[in-house]
Amino acid sequence: MDNNNNNFSTPKQPTINSTTGGQLRSRSNSSPSTSSISTPRNGSTTATTSSITNSIGKGSLVFSTMENAKKTLNMDSLSTPMSQSSKKRLSMNSSLLPPSSIPLPPSQQLSAKKDPSKRHSSFISTTTTTSLGSRPSTPQPNHTTNNNNNNNNGSNGNNVTSTNISSMLESNNSEILSQNQKVTLSTSSNTAFSSLPSSTNNGNNPLSNSGGGNGNHHLVNSNSSTSTPSPTMFISTTSPPPELSLMEGFNQHNLTTTTTTTTTTTNNTLNTSNGINSNSLSPSSHLNNGSNNNNNNNHLNLNNRSSSPSPTPSSSSISGRRTPIQNFNSVGGVNITSKTQPLFSDREESIQAVCRFRPETAAEQTLGPSEKQLTIGTDQTTIHITPTSSSSSSMAQAFRFSKVYQPNTTQESFYNEVGKPLIDNIVNGYNVGIIAYGQTGAGKTFSLGFSGGEGNDSYNSYCNRSEFYNNSHYLYGSQQQQQQQQLLPSSWGIMPRIIKDLFIKQDEQQSMNTPQRIKFTTKISYLEVYKEKVYDLLSEGGVNDIEIRMADGGFIVPDAVQSSIQTFTDFLTHLQHIEKNRKIAETKKNMASSRSHAIFIVSLLKEDLENKMTVTSLLYLVDLAGSESASKIDGTTSKIEETKSINKSLYALGGVIEDMSKNSKHVRYRDSKLTQLLQQCFGGNSKTCLIVNCSSSNHESVIRETIQSLNFGQRAQSVKNKPLQNVEESHSELKAKLRELNKDIETYKKFIEKISINSGVIPPSSVATYITQLQNACEELKKKNDRLQEDIINLEEENSDLPKKFNVLNKNNVSQIEILTQELELSKQINQEQLLKIEQYSQKYQATNEEIQKSFNHRQQLVNDLHDSNEKSKQLELKLKDALLNSKSESDEIRLKLTKALEESTDKDQRINTLESNKQKWKSKCNEVVRQSKELQDRLNILQSTYSNSVDSLSNSSLNNNNNESLEEIKKLKLNISSLTNQHIEREKSLQKEIDLARSKHTEQTLILKNLKTQIDTLTNKLEIQFPTIVNNNQQQQQSTQSSSSSSIESNLIISMNTIEVLFEKICKNQEQTNTIISTNVESIMGKLVEIDENEEFIRKEKDRERERAENLKNTLEDAQSNFLKQQEEIKQFIETQLKNKNNINNNNNIKNNNNNNKLKSKKVGSSSSSSSNIGSSICINILFFLIILVILFFLMVAVGLTIQNQDYNSQYRSSYFFKTT
């Protein structure tokens, strides 16, 4: 039961330098600054008082809002009543919190430089208790606190004024004088010791002995009965605003300053079994948000934990034992004053691994000796495996964990140190994972508590007593908790105990608040991974192979059953049903070995009905199946397959750990169903604790498996999670934050208006120099302020030493009181002089505050300039986007043109190929015609040679003349035809050359276009690659400028602008280069196209001339043909008339001869003449036929040549048109 239910967090316990005891080494990532108190060598006790030290660090502080700066500067706005001395201390400490983001040197911190032992201690007062070196966290909405930083209703939000320090110092000095007068009066009446309060060892004094106390003290003294109290003028300071992170890594709430004493005392006893303190600070005080659990059984720190005392097991007396119990006991006691660090924190943290050893089994006790020995270090965090003999070749090994538990550790103590501190985190909205790992039979299921009741009892034996539990479920107090503790079997592990405490915690929170204000909803789900298939054990019969889906937050199992439970009895009934469905089999090392991975998930929903805020959290309790070599299994193939699947999933889990430790970009979660389900525990947002279960046997075969488990646990500690609080804020809270932000914006606008009225705008070029000047001026002012503060501290120390001097003088001799009174009078005069000095210092301090305010205003102006530059960068980004889009559109158009040109070029190539094929066909036909003409000419020559004599004899002179003329014309025609054919052939050759040139030019142009296309593609790719990098650089620079100081803001701004300008210039240059390349290529193409056009015009003119020539030839041929036909007809008619005349003459001669009685002679002559006439007519007919064939062939050749010429001209004209269009 909590003694303090307010919003205070338990303070840290300081470190005491002691010469005895071992030192516990903490494995936490970072340790807070704690105070140290030196003990005198002579054994005398001295009072320890020191000034407060706010660990600011070397970096600068930044106010998140203007109101926080006003709160820090205007100390009159603090609503909590306090004394003038406390106001003085607050005003002095306010100088530690400079306005705006102007960097402060480390010397600005208040520290007692003369006494190094006082630098890291805090002020001690009877008013409040604050934690050392802690930072306040965000306040919880469920608790109400008197926070000094939230009550500023009386202060003006626009006027920032400095504190009237002189009045505070005067009041403070008046209090000192009045106190000194009381001291003099008390010493004069011999009652000096009775008037001053003395600190005795009763547990109620902050400076009490370390043997007592409740864990809320700040400092611990040596063993003395009395100590000198600290002066009443030293009070604890109020914590800075929650927006100022003075220290990193502590989860504590805002501290409030009250005038009443809030220290509570509890007399705790020390349990010194094995030399380990079991009643140190409670782990929950470091882990919980504002809770302080003062149960005596839970006061063990997670980094300074010891094994709970338990009787020595009876198995130690068995003969043949190779591992004695004393090997696992600490050699020396652990120092109780060592630093206590929490196992879990709110920032990025590593997985915490603990190791638990189980006692040896009967089979392990009969094993022979080994060359290695396993021991636990005195700090209870290290495990050493050393060779027993120097001759062995094995090397010594050491493993470090957060805590190592010995075999005699009980279930209750193990849970109190590992599981119980996590309950508050679960209730407050953090995901928690507890995972048990180890070899088969190492005690994983026993540690988590998945087994049955005590001894041979089962869950039914506990369910029979559920009626008593339900009746006492809503009672509170130590008696009821003791009754519930007696109900729980001692052999039960973490799972039932943490569920029980969760319900108790829920009922406690519901009882502390108004009825029906907080509502809890608890649901459970139970999954089993068996042979890479997920089973839902809460469903009837267990659903086989449930689907795992990928969501925004990771992997989810949407089809899994979630059963709602309202009491601990409901949980037990579900668990009884679940355990029957688990896959359990017998192995060599375990009679009931878990052959599957069990994942028990508890989802908790906390609803604040008044504030309308919900908090969700998940609890993972994972019982991993034991890894075992397949060669050691004697069984069927199904058991071998089970072992292979178990080893495969554990290997995948090791791969995930390896990826996380190496910070690789891709983590192999998808290699196994187990790694998918445990994504939140390894690398997610949960607080994860890995329990490495091992055997305590020293046999070599067992130690080999133990080393494997220890290596896995040590590697798992390198994985870092980022725990986050799952809180959903209501609309009203978000609206309130929005209103505050709007108010801040309005204040900023007003400041901007004032700055614009009072001073001009600084140009961007001189911003950097102006910032450096402001920084130098601020550093000088800070140095002056440091000197003033040192003087003030020295004066305060001198004033605080006065009553001590009176006490010492009173102890030595009462007669020296008069001298002391005189000294007091002198001190009064000195104080008056000091007051004057302090007034002067206060005036200087006020001036420095005004200058700082001016610098703050200038910084606001610089911030505005930064916003303007960000807007300009955004405009540049938009311009770059437009340029990219335009270039993309132009490139797309060029691509379309290129594709069209390529398609047309391919079509033309195909046409040219078809024309060439046709041309070759025509050429072949022409060759055949020429060949046939040659054959006919040969025949004609033969005929001419054979029948030339007969023709000459038959033809008359006129016939011979006509034939000669016709033959000459025919010869001339032949010559013309041959010349025309030669010209046509030459023209074809020239045209072929021109076609080849056009093709070569076409190929060159296609290559040029392809190169242009590749260049355009590369440019677009470069633009697409460079544009997001520019945007990311701008965003990163904006983020860095927001988090850095004013100097770094301006330098980063200039650098980012220069980089943007350089990149923009590069892009413009690249664009210009591409444009020039494109323009040059286009010009060259256009020139080539002009040349092609000119060539086409020349070719067209030549073709026109050829056409005219062909037409003239056609006309001449037609005329010649018509003349030839006419001549042929005349020749035919002449020949016919001649033949008729000859026939008539011959007939007349024959008649005459017949009449003259020479019948025989006349018959011979008639036969010879008729035969000769018949032969001449046949020869003339053949010659005419041959001539007609030649003329027809000539016309055919001319027609073929004209068609080929027309086709070539059409192809060239189309190609020229294509190039013109491109």
Curated annotation (Swiss-Prot):
Name the domain of life: Eukaryota
Q: Which InterPro entries does this entry report, sorted A to Z?
A: Kinesin-like_fam, Kinesin_motor_dom, Kinesin_motor_dom_sf, P-loop_NTPase
Enumerate the Gene Ontology biological process terms.
centrosome cycle; cytoskeleton-dependent intracellular transport; maintenance of centrosome location; microtubule depolymerization; microtubule-based movement; mitotic cell cycle
> What spans are recorded as compositionally biased (Polar residues)?
1-25, 75-85, 326-343
- What are the boundaries of the region Disordered? 1-55, 75-165, 188-343, 1144-1174
Predominant location: membrane
**Matches recorded under Pfam families:** Kinesin (PF00225)
Q: Where are the transmembrane segments?
A: 1183-1203
Name all Kinesin motor domain ranges: 350-719
Per the record, its GO cellular-component terms are:
cytoplasm; kinesin complex; membrane; microtubule; nuclear envelope
- Coiled-coil portions: 724-1026
Q: MF terms per GO, please?
A: ATP binding; ATP hydrolysis activity; microtubule binding; plus-end-directed microtubule motor activity
Topology of this chain in the membrane: Single-pass membrane protein
Ranges of Low complexity composition bias in the record: 26-55, 122-165, 194-209, 216-238, 254-325
**Where is this protein found?**
Membrane; Cytoplasm, Cytoskeleton
Family that this chain belongs to: Belongs to the TRAFAC class myosin-kinesin ATPase superfamily. Kinesin family.
- Name under which the protein is recorded: Kinesin-related protein 9
